[in-house]
Amino acid sequence: IADFWKIAEAGCIAASKEFEIEVQVIMPPEASAVVQKQKVEDVIATGIQGIAISPLDADNQIEWLNSIAEKMPMITHDSDSPASKRLVYIGMDNYAAGRACGEILKKALPEGGQVLLCIGRLEQDNSKFRRQGVIDVLMERDRTIDFYKEQPNAFDPTEGEIKSDIFTIVATVTDQGKPEVALQKAEDALVTWPELKGIAGLFEYNPPACYQALKKAGKLKQIALAGFDENDVTLQAIRDGECAGTVVQNPYEYGFQSVRVLNELLSGNKDIIPKSRYIDIAPRAITAENVETYWEELKRLKGQ
């Protein structure tokens, strides 16, 4: 289980103590919509009264999510299912976060070059927007998330190259949420594209997998690496000048705010839901300039 979710769990536990309510945190052992559904059905059968969920396959889980929403207050966090009957989404603008990651890579590669995108899966709402944000920065497109919400078919295709004047995105490789597959795909990519100049790892375990592949190939500091989330390997690589930076969410707040909102809803306070049905927990870019202070703060949240 990614550190990201352990930090989110710490936020849930803190909120459960503050609001004196019982909270269970369920983390499926694999990133599978089938396993997720089974785990959720099992816990619903125990008589829970509300749920915060990060849908693994938003488009294909709508009917099932709606069936849950008919039984109890249901909110989404981290990844959204905007077409479902969820009451609110707690998380960040993944498109803006993707753009922040793209900016890190662009700054590290002023001459441009070939870039590889690595991500767990593209069925999730968060991953689609995150990937597109990176692409649009490298392609010099001045857009916001609304462009894609209004034109859901405008996302770049997942196959083939995407080119601008100086950047070529050679491919988007997926690993279905498996770090060992992410490592293998990164190693293979370094052989397939020997002229590669940059890599963006868009799920928590992707930057460490890419880092290991670069280290094994003797290409650290030769190929720029930008990432997502706060894995210790990623933060150490930033500190050592071997990773240009990472875009971090605030999983502690995802957990804390999810419990707070569900508690308010169960108390009958529907005013807790904003008109936008979106509670924004803004992302941050972590680079060599601020990695030390951020890491100290992270250790405090994790109780280390």
PLM region descriptions:
Residues 1-304:
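A residue-level marker of the well-folded mature domains of exported/periplasmic proteins
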